[in-house]
Curated annotation (Swiss-Prot):
CDD domains the UniProt entry points to: TM_PBP2
Protein name: Probable ABC transporter permease protein YesQ
Pfam families hit by this protein: BPD_transp_1
Main localisation: membrane
Membrane-spanning parts: 27-47, 96-116, 126-146, 161-181, 206-226, 262-282
Keyword annotations from UniProtKB, A to Z: Cell membrane, Membrane, Transmembrane, Transmembrane helix, Transport
InterPro entries the UniProt entry points to: MetI-like, MetI-like_sf
One Gene Ontology term from the biological process aspect of the record: transmembrane transport
PROSITE patterns in alphabetical order: ABC_TM1 (PS50928)
Subcellular location(s) of the protein: Cell membrane
Encoding gene (name): yesQ
Occurrences of domain ABC transmembrane type-1 (ranges): 91-282
Entry annotated with the keyword Membrane: yes
Sequence similarity: Belongs to the binding-protein-dependent transport system permease family. MalFG subfamily.
Length: 296
C-alpha cells in the first residue's frame, strides 16, 4: 500500500499575525532591562572614560563620556606606583592574599561540608546551627577581639591575619557544598568503602571531583571578596610594601594637596580587569553551582 500524503494544515491568518506580533509587555520588559543595565554599567563606563582624562578636568567634565583631550599618561604614571612602590608590587600582594585565602577557604570548607553531610556524630544539628548562625554575625563585632588576638601573636604587618582564618572554613561555602554533597547518592560512598577506601580516600577520590561546580563557585566568590577587601588590610597592614591593590588606591588621594585622580582611576580600571575576566570565563560555574545546590 502506498502511504497517503495528507495535506499540511496551515494556521489561520489571524494566528500567524498573532504569533509574529510583539506584545507591549515584552517591549516594556526589554526597555526596562536595557535601562537597568545602562544604570548599573554607567559608573564603570564613567570610571574607564575618566582614566583617559586629565586630573583637573575629570570632575569639571563629568557629564561628558568623551575624553578631551584623550591621554594615556595616567596609566604610565599610575603604573610607576606611589609611596616608593611600583603598582606591580600591590598586584603581587593582592595575588598572594587572594590565592592563599581562596585555597584555604575552599579546601577547608569542603572537608567540613563532607563531615556534616556524610559523617554521623553527636550534636551534629547543634553544631550545624551554630555554624549557620555565624552567617548572621556582623564582621564588625569580631574586628576588635581578632585584632587584639593577632597583636598578641605578633601577626600585625603580615598577611597572616588575613589569610590564616580562611583555613578554618567559611559558613556560606560550607552550606553551599553540603547541599551539593547531599545530591550525590550515598551508594557511591558505600561502594568505595567496600573497595577499601577510608573516609579521607572516599572524600578525595569520590566526593571532591563530583562537587567541582560547588568548588568553582566558592573559589570565584572568595576571589571577588578578597580582591576588593579593604577593612582587613587597613587594620593589619601599615607598611606600603605590603599593601594590596584595594588599599594602595587610597594612596593616590591626598587630603593636604591635589589628589592624582587620573592615576587612581587608571589603576582602578586595571584592578577591575581580573574581576571582569574571571566573571566572563567562569560565570557558568556560578550559575551551575548555585542552581544545583537547590536540588535535593
Amino acid at each position: 500500500m502506498e502511504p497517503v500524503n495528507q495535506p499540511v494544515r496551515e494556521a489561520p491568518v489571524f494566528e500567524r499575525k498573532k504569533a509574529g506580533r510583539v506584545s507591549p509587555k515584552r517591549i516594556l520588559f526589554h526597555v526596562f532591562t536595557a535601562t537597568l543595565a545602562v544604570l548599573l554599567l554607567y559608573p564603570v563606563i564613567w570610571l574607564f572614560v575618566s582614566s583617559f582624562k586629565e586630573s583637573a578636568s575629570i570632575f569639571t567634565t563629568s557629564h561628558s563620556l568623551i575624553p578631551d583631550p584623550f591621554i594615556l599618561s595616567n596609566y604610565a604614571e599610575g603604573w610607576k606606583g606611589i609611596a616608593g612602590q611600583p603598582f606591580l608590587t600591590f598586584i603581587k600582594n593582592s595575588a598572594i592574599i587572594v590565592g592563599l585565602s581562596t585555597i584555604g577557604a575552599v579546601m577547608s570548607s569542603a572537608v567540613i561540608a563532607y563531615g556534616f553531610a556524610r559523617i554521623p556524630f553527636k550534636g551534629k544539628k547543634f553544631w550545624f546551627a551554630c555554624m549557620m548562625g555565624t552567617l548572621m554575625l556582623p564582621h564588625e563585632v569580631l574586628m576588635i577581639p581578632q585584632y587584639i588576638m593577632f597583636a598578641k601573636l605578633d601577626w600585625l604587618n603580615s598577611f597572616k591575619p588575613i589569610v590564616v582564618p580562611q583555613f578554618f572554613g567559611h559558613a556560606f561555602f560550607i552550606f553551599l557544598m553540603i547541599q551539593f554533597i547531599r545530591t550525590i547518592p550515598e551508594e557511591l560512598d558505600e561502594a568505595a568503602r567496600i573497595d577499601g577506601c577510608g573516609r579521607f580516600a572516599c572524600f578525595w577520590r569520590i566526593i571532591l571531583p563530583l562537587i567541582a561546580p560547588a568548588l568553582a563557585t566558592s573559589a570565584i566568590f572568595s576571589f571577588y571578596w578578597k580582591w576588593e577587601e579593604l577593612i582587613q588590610p587597613l587594620l593589619y597592614l601599615n607598611k606600603p610594601e605590603l599593601y594590596p591593590v584595594s588599599l594602595a588606591l587610597k594612596l593616590f588621594l591626598d587630603t593636604e594637596s591635589a589628589s592624582n585622580w587620573g592615576a587612581m582611576f587608571a589603576m582602578s580600571a586595571v584592578s577591575l580587569l581580573p574581576v571582569i575576566l574571571v566573571f566572563f570565563l567562569f560565570q557558568k560555574y556560578i550559575v551551575q553551582g548555585i542552581s544545583t545546590t537547590g536540588l535535593k
